[in-house]
Amino acid sequence: MGILGLSKLLYDRSPAAIRERELKNYFGRRIAIDASMTIYQFIIAMKGFQDGQGMELTNEAGEVTSHLNGLFARTLRMVDEGLRPIYVFDGKPPTLKASELQERRQRAEEAQQLFDTAKEEGNDELMEKMSKRTVRVSREQLEEAKKLLQLMGIPVVQAPSEAEAQCAELVKKKKAWAVATEDMDALTFGAPVMLRHLTYSEAKKRPIAEFHLDEILGITGLTMTQFIDLCILLGCDYVPKIPGIGPQKAWEGIKKHGDIETLLQSLDAGRHSVPEGFHYEEARQFFLKPEVTPAEEIEIQFREPDEEGLVKFLVEEKLFNKDRVLKGIQRLRNALTRKTQGRLDQFFTITRPVTKPNTCDAKAGVKRGHSAIALSGTLQQKGSSGHKKVVKK
């Protein structure tokens, strides 16, 4: 879930702290990526619908390969542009998240029931909508993703708990430059720079949103603890939300009272009932001091791709097109060995002007010199991967 309504609130209250960028703007940057969120996006993007049946990207053996296709293609696209992706995987969820996870399971069950009803009624639109709400990333898919990345020579970090918190730790300790995730709570965990839409496909044509925490705090006048309290009131994964407290009231409440304790004392009990389990002190402490592996103990190293291992895994086991895989390996080698010029900010101190965010999008219609798979739309025939959309009965 992340933080409900935080993105819109920041666009309204601190737009100068947000930039709109393109992939090429991160040349030479190490980016810590929320792996589970990214893989979930790939599975959703490649899940289609046709003639009343769900469709998924599979190989000739019928195995779902959406996660591997998306991860392979998008990672290659990033390294082509000079990025250095670091994928961080979730560990054990914190106890505070138990209620949220239970609610997610219930919502998935309800979505499945609605899907079944829509199927009986022949409502294709509702079936497609509900089918995406039932998607879950399996343990097997996560392990396959780790294996693929390691064979590609891309760093993999296993977080002890929340991936966003571990990503923030890497950025705070200068092991990476930014966190890439769709969950806004990366900022709540203290990530100095956060990117949204980094792993979106080119077909979506959405610019990357770059959030700067120091500027957000400076423009809004909030301390980090007040920002955390604001996020808790907006709605997070660790405590239930107070009914009747929306973004505007949460903002005004923290600006006026300074913290949740004082705000709660001012609430009209008849209008706002604080739910049982609103342990905001524990949530606040978890945001301030989450369970992470200290960045100093993590080695980040980009390695030569394992050609033999990739061919065995992707071509022999997962039935990928061999030519596509070999070309991908060469692209990885080119990125690893390329003699690149340093970024200017490695030699000079760059002062970022506080201005209106750059809204320049990438030019549409420009053909790329390499192949990439679209992560949206319906694939009717085999693509360069050798895989195709099949009806899931």
From Swiss-Prot:
Subcellular location field: Nucleus, Nucleolus; Nucleus, Nucleoplasm; Mitochondrion
Q: Give the span(s) annotated as I-domain.
A: 126-257
Among the record's GO biological process terms, what is one?
base-excision repair
Q: What does this protein do?
A: Structure-specific nuclease with 5'-flap endonuclease and 5'-3' exonuclease activities involved in DNA replication and repair. During DNA replication, cleaves the 5'-overhanging flap structure that is generated by displacement synthesis when DNA polymerase encounters the 5'-end of a downstream Okazaki fragment. It enters the flap from the 5'-end and then tracks to cleave the flap base, leaving a nick for ligation. Also involved in the long patch base excision repair (LP-BER) pathway, by cleaving within the apurinic/apyrimidinic (AP) site-terminated flap.
Kindly provide the name given to this protein in its UniProt entry.
Answer: Flap endonuclease 1
PROSITE patterns, per this entry?
XPG_1 (PS00841), XPG_2 (PS00842)
Organism equals: Trypanosoma cruzi (strain CL Brener)
- PTM entry text: Phosphorylated. Phosphorylation upon DNA damage induces relocalization to the nuclear plasma.
Quaternary structure and partners: Interacts with PCNA. Three molecules of FEN1 bind to one PCNA trimer with each molecule binding to one PCNA monomer. PCNA stimulates the nuclease activity without altering cleavage specificity.
User: For this protein, what is the EC number?
Assistant: 3.1.-.-
Question: Which residues are Mg(2+) 2-binding?
Answer: D183, D185, D237
Q: Which residues bind DNA?
A: R74, E162, G235, D237
One GO term in the molecular function aspect is: DNA binding
Note describing how the cofactor binds: Binds 2 magnesium ions per subunit. They probably participate in the reaction catalyzed by the enzyme. May bind an additional third magnesium ion after substrate binding.
| Co-factor(s) | Mg(2+)
Q: Name one GO cellular component term.
A: nucleolus
The UniProt entry's sequence similarity note says: Belongs to the XPG/RAD2 endonuclease family. FEN1 subfamily.
**Which residue ranges are recorded for the region named Interaction with PCNA?**
340-348
**Pfam families for the chain:** XPG_I (PF00867), XPG_N (PF00752)
In its keyword annotation, does this UniProt entry include rRNA-binding?
A: no
Tell me the lineage of the source organism. Eukaryota, Discoba, Euglenozoa, Kinetoplastea, Metakinetoplastina
Q: Which InterPro entries match?
A: 5-3_exonuclease_C_sf, Flap_endonuc, HhH2, PIN-like_dom_sf, XPG-I_dom, XPG/Rad2, XPG_CS, XPG_DNA_repair_N
Keywords, sorted A to Z: DNA damage, DNA repair, DNA replication, Endonuclease, Exonuclease, Hydrolase, Magnesium, Metal-binding, Mitochondrion, Nuclease, Nucleus, Phosphoprotein
Q: Binding positions for Mg(2+) 1?
A: D34, D90, E162, E164
Spell out the residue ranges making up region: N-domain. Answer: 1-108
